[in-house]
């Protein structure tokens, strides 16, 4: 795992096409913006797991 320190307004590049920008910090919450091509899915972890669960349920039926 890569661990980085970023300040508000700073950006992290993932590959050539995905950027993650720190938009704000308030208490223990960090607001981030993700810019990625349409073919790249971007989800919060809990949503991603829900999607995977629903896909597995559909394949069982």
From Swiss-Prot:
Record keyword Repressor present: yes
Keywords: Activator, Cytoplasm, Repressor, RNA-binding, Translation regulation
A GO term from the CC aspect: cytosol
Disulfide bonds: none
SUPFAM superfamilies listed in its UniProt record: CsrA-like
Pfam families tied to this protein: CsrA (PF02599)
GO MF term set: mRNA 5'-UTR binding
Localization: Cytoplasm
Keyword presence, Repressor: yes
Superkingdom classification of source: Bacteria
Any one of the GO BP annotations: positive regulation of translational initiation
Family that this chain belongs to: Belongs to the CsrA/RsmA family.
Described function: A key translational regulator that binds mRNA to regulate translation initiation and/or mRNA stability. Mediates global changes in gene expression, shifting from rapid growth to stress survival by linking envelope stress, the stringent response and the catabolite repression systems. Usually binds in the 5'-UTR; binding at or near the Shine-Dalgarno sequence prevents ribosome-binding, repressing translation, binding elsewhere in the 5'-UTR can activate translation and/or stabilize the mRNA. Its function is antagonized by small RNA(s).
HAMAP family documented for this protein: CsrA
Oligomer and partners: Homodimer; the beta-strands of each monomer intercalate to form a hydrophobic core, while the alpha-helices form wings that extend away from the core.
Name listed for the protein in its UniProt record: Translational regulator CsrA
Organism (species): Baumannia cicadellinicola subsp. Homalodisca coagulata
């Amino acid at each position: 795992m890569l661990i980085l320190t970023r300040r508000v307004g700073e950006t992290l590049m993932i590959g050539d096409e995905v950027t993650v920008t720190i938009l704000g910090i308030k208490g223990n919450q960090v607001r981030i913006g993700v810019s990625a091509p349409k073919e790249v899915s971007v989800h919060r972890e809990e949503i991603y797991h829900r999607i995977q669960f629903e896909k597995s349920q559909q394949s069982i039926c």
